[in-house]
Amino acid sequence: DCKVINERINKENAKNILSDHDILIDCVDNFETRFIVNDLALDLKIPLVSGAIGKFDGQVSTFLNTKDSPCYRCFVPETPPNAETCSQLGVIGATAGIIGSMMALEAIKIITQAGNTLNGKIFIFKGLEMISKTIKLPKDLKCIACS
């Protein structure tokens, strides 16, 4: 079953809401919630598929939360200065569709154990140029969440 949670996640309710799931798919638009979801996924050893969009660009990554793999905080250790939300940047529906479909595919690969996931990598999509690239995400040995 797929369960959509239409409730704001915070430190107080996250474990109660998210702990009974096989995969967490992070579709939030702020760093505070991303950090809460990442930290809980690590604590409970639940795979996390994370995606982000802004106008024409997007990114997808998978964090399997194994001993040797990076977590979201290895990639973004703290909220970037001047971080903008989707409401500030604007959202193009087609970009959300592309990134959302890729996130769904990552979840399917985890469930079926088919192919290789983006664990330890990030897929970056540039919609205006119609280019994409996948880069490696190294584990931060000084990460406050997973090291």
What are these regions (language model features)?
Residues 3-8:
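Conserved acidic residues
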